[in-house]
């Protein structure tokens, strides 16, 4: 496989740019420690409900039984006949709504 001088030069320049960006991130981490890490900030945020986010998300995805739209999560926001179902408009939504 033959590579042109231009493609090799561009590959070297892009590789160096990636190394520079990684080095800048590493410097920031070494200076500020975990306090500069976004994940650390997200972990320290208070949770408004009694359940942690992962538990709420798992309950939302795994539990399809509902009594009202408030029991359904964002992926399946509509409660029909005791089950959380996606809200789909148009012809497909009409067919799915008729079946359920």
UniProtKB/Swiss-Prot annotation:
The keyword Disulfide bond applies. Keywords: Calcium channel impairing toxin, Disulfide bond, Ion channel impairing toxin, Knottin, Neurotoxin, Secreted, Signal, Toxin, Voltage-gated calcium channel impairing toxin. GO terms for molecular function: calcium channel regulator activity; sodium channel inhibitor activity; toxin activity. Its main location: secreted. The keyword Signal applies. Residues 24-55 form a propeptide. Residues 1-23 form the signal peptide. Gene3D superfamilies: 4.10.40.10. It is found in: Secreted. Disulfide bonds join 60-73, 66-79, 72-84. Potent inhibitor of insect, but not mammalian, voltage-gated calcium channels (Cav). This is Omega-hexatoxin-Asp2b. It comes from Atrax sp. (strain Illawarra) (Funnel-web spider).
């Amino acid at each position: 496989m033959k590579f042109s001088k231009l493609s090799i030069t561009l590959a070297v320049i892009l590789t160096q740019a990636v190394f520079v960006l990684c080095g800048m991130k590493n410097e920031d981490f070494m200076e500020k420690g975990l306090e500069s890490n976004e994940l650390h900030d997200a972990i320290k945020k208070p949770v408004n409900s009694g359940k942690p986010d992962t538990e709420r998300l798992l309950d939302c995805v795994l539990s399809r039984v509902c009594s009202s739209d408030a029991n359904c999560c964002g992926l399946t926001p509509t409660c029909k006949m005791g089950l959380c179902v996606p809200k789909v408009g148009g012809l497909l939504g009409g067919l799915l709504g008729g079946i359920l």
